[in-house]
């Protein structure tokens, strides 16, 4: 089946978060994103979302650099000739170094279109079989421990299957101790976002007593070696996030013993195809995976749901309900959580309708790119 993309629309959106979200890197009150729409010659649309942030705190990519890469390099490559399978794009994009979030946004839109043309849900096109997925929730650093406990209480009452608490050197052991005292049985993990160094090994080891599911990305994003030195010192499994940008990164991390769990983020690794390859590798190695979040709007959230239906996604992910972040999302129906589960949509493609009225409301500017007559 050949997919002939007639044109691509890039939209720059800005959405206000319902509440500020704080990590060891800073506080977010709004999310800028690029929404990618690809339209074939029959007028069928596929949707993707760039998860890059406005500033390069998570990686070197930003919304502005993603727009530049999409406009000047990636969109022309996608429009150059028909596409028979979305994974062909990774070969077309191979000459472009890094810029994984930009690549993933465009590839994701093509995956959505591909699944719609097949008449199957995106989850099925990827090889997933789950009807429901377990989800957890990520909670940013709060003004006080009392505030944090109130937030956790609210999400536990809503049935979330796992609680993730952001930590940093001034907000870690004592905070987790109090959380565990109040919630002794809640599946709990800590996310450091690279806030520590190997010098802090004893401090990180102090977290062992709290029975955490994992500690996520304690050390620098580019340091697999020190993570390999740290893991044997801890009872708590290390989960790598920012360190894993590709299949090869995952392979090296597992070979070195840098982690026991991997967080797969579609944007960080360059698309659904690479995410699936990493999933398959981890399944072979006996390393569980889960799907992390990047404050996605509805389109990105739908892609996360689809990839999480693969068999080795055995730990609850960060794909919380739309209402956790937004007053109004850009999809209908919005993503809802019931009893800690999200029902996987069974409609073709991402399974949700894009709410064009809301998209228009959030759009700051847009640009259309047409296929040339020779393409």
Curated annotation (Swiss-Prot):
Its EC number is 4.2.1.113, 5.1.1.-. GO terms for biological process: menaquinone biosynthetic process. SUPFAM superfamilies: Enolase C-terminal domain-like, Enolase N-terminal domain-like. Converts 2-succinyl-6-hydroxy-2,4-cyclohexadiene-1-carboxylate (SHCHC) to 2-succinylbenzoate (OSB). Also acts as a N-succinylamino acid racemase (NSAR) that catalyzes the racemization of N-succinyl-D/L-phenylalanine. Can catalyze the racemization of a broad range of N-acylamino acids, including N-acetyl-D-methionine, N-formyl-D/L-methionine, N-formyl-D/L-norleucine, N-formyl-D/L-aminobutyric acid, N-formyl-D/L-norvaline, N-formyl-D/L-homophenylalanine, N-carbamoyl-D-methionine and N-carbamoyl-D-norleucine. Belongs to the mandelate racemase/muconate lactonizing enzyme family. MenC type 2 subfamily. HAMAP family: MenC_2. This is o-succinylbenzoate synthase. The gene is menC.
